[in-house]
């Protein structure tokens, strides 16, 4: 349905599986029709890693840079500050741009910004965001994507569409999308 709505490029900042990488390869080789796909693949998270050294972080990120052929990763609260710094160093060495997950933790967001993570997905878990946080983000040139579909501390935009639109009767969506997905 993406192409039917004029979407020619997609970016998935984190997937639970590697399926999207296969889909991307199939689009790139012309086996299926679809938008260009950029994805991190599965997140680098606390559930899968407990790095004991920079070398362990480098080895783990090789699956992303060499096998998944991704240019970005999404780091999910992967350990203490030292471990997060190792991920950042390993990513830079392998030319992977890491982004972070907001995690409903402003202190975590701030240390990741200070340490040099170039991106954050999801909003800060506070409102309003004051000039000190805005200034730090601007000074470090960190990309800040509030990800309004999944808002921390506020209403999810996804629910807004289900409440205000009748997706089950959208002809184009139903033509290009399996019923179970709608």
Question: What does each model-found stretch correspond to?
Answer:
Residues 15-26, 77-90, 128-139:
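Active-site-adjacent beta->alpha loops and helix N-cap segments on the catalytic face
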Residues 1-18, 34-45, 67-78, 88, ...:
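Divalent metal-dependent hydrolysis catalytic cores, especially in the metallo-beta-lactamase
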Residues 27-35, 93-96:
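Short helix-capping segments at alpha-helix termini
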Residues 1-2, 64-67, 87, 91, ...:
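Generic structural signal for hydrophobic
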Residues 1, 49-64, 102-111:
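Short, acidic/polar
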Residues 87, 93, 99, 103-116:
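Functional cores that coordinate and move charged inorganic groups
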Residues 28-30, 117-122, 138, 161-165:
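Short, hinge-like loop/turn segments at secondary-structure boundaries
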């Amino acid at each position: 349905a993406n192409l039917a709505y004029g979407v020619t490029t997609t970016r998935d900042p984190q997937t639970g599986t590697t399926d999207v990488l296969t889909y991307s390869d199939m689009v790139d080789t012309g086996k299926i029709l679809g938008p260009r796909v950029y994805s991190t693949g599965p997140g680098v998270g606390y559930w899968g890693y407990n790095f004991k050294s920079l070398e362990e972080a480098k080895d783990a990120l090789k699956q992303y840079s060499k096998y998944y052929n991704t240019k970005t990763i999404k780091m999910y609260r992967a350990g203490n500050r030292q471990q997060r710094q190792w991920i950042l160093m390993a990513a830079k060495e392998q030319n992977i741009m890491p982004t972070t997950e907001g995690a409903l933790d402003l202190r975590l967001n701030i240390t990741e910004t200070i340490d040099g993570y170039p991106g954050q997905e999801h909003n800060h878990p506070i409102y309003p965001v004051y000039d000190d946080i805005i200034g730090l983000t601007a000074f470090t040139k960190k990309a800040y994507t509030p990800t309004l579909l999944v808002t921390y501390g506020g209403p999810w935009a996804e629910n807004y569409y289900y409440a205000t639109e009748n997706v089950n009767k959208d002809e184009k969506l139903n033509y290009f999308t399996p019923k179970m997905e709608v």
